[in-house]
Every structure is written in C-alpha cells, then in structure tokens.
UniProtKB/Swiss-Prot annotation:
Gene name linked to the record: rplT
Keyword set, alphabetical order: Ribonucleoprotein, Ribosomal protein, RNA-binding, rRNA-binding
GO cellular component entries: ribonucleoprotein complex; ribosome
Lineage: Bacteria, Bacillati, Bacillota, Bacilli, Bacillales
PANTHER family: 39S RIBOSOMAL PROTEIN L20
Keyword Amino-acid biosynthesis: no
Protein name per the record: Large ribosomal subunit protein bL20
Family note: Belongs to the bacterial ribosomal protein bL20 family.
Amino acid sequence: MPRVKGGTVTRQRRKKVIKLAKGYYGSKNTLFKVANQQVMKSLMYAFRDRRQKKRDFRKLWITRINAAARMNGLSYSRLMHGLKNAGIEVNRKMLADLAVHDEKAFAELATVAKNNIN
C-alpha cells in the first residue's frame, strides 16, 4: 500500500492554523506544531475572558458608583438600598454612566435614595 502524504487537506488545515497565529512572537507564527499549541491556548483564553469581561465591567461600574455616592454622602450599599426602596430600577451600567457624565442627575438620585433609607 503506498504512503499517503495528506496533500491539499493537510496543507489547508495547517494554513488555517498559521493564519490564526498571525502576529504571534517567534516561532509561534511560523511552525505548525508550536502555532497549533498557541492557537489552542489563545482560544481557551478567549473563552475564559469573555466571561471574565462581564465580571470586570460590573466591578468597574460598582467602583464608579461608590465613588460618586461617597461624594454625595452615601456609601454604595446605602445608595442601592435607598434606590430599591424608592422603586427606582436603574441598572449599575446606567448609574455608572450617570456618575461619570451627568453628575447633577446622579446627585438627584442620591438625594432620593437618602430620603428613602429607613
């Protein structure tokens, strides 16, 4: 039985991996075996960090809301408690945006929260 070298299918598969490894340092963008390992690891990082990104942004929003709340004489938890008691359902992303770009509106929300803390 003659030896089969793989031909076009193998070449296409390897070219696909090398294309994904474009921009990698050293031999990781030219040698198939090393590039394949790095591409697999990169895809794992991408999968993990798509989930991590959501946690990171939530932490950032909470930090920004806390800083703005303290400028208005409240802690983050008391602000959120007051807003919940007042029936104001604004998500953290929008609150953080208000804290950064519209301080007057955030101050109004803070006063409403202060008035609704038990």
